[in-house]
Amino acid sequence: MSKDDIRGHILEVAGAIFAAEGFQNATVRKICAQADVNVAAINYYFGDKERLYIEAVKNARRLIERRWP
């Protein structure tokens, strides 16, 4: 998988978990387990949970705008 593919996969998984559980209840470890990556990958691509959340929301918005311009 390329770096872009890994980053995108993490965003998809994180978006689903944040949507289902909310920011407070979603954990980086849970996201890592479902995305099949380690915590270092989250830190490498996003820095921290808050930044991951922001990027996941931006990603969801992009997907919505593509679907319904």
Language model features by range: what are they?
Residues 3-11:
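Onset of an N-terminal alpha helix
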Residues 56-69:
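Amphipathic alpha-helical linker/stalk segments
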Residues 1-4, 16:
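N-terminal intrinsically disordered/low-complexity leader segments
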Residues 9, 17-51, 55:
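Helix-turn-helix
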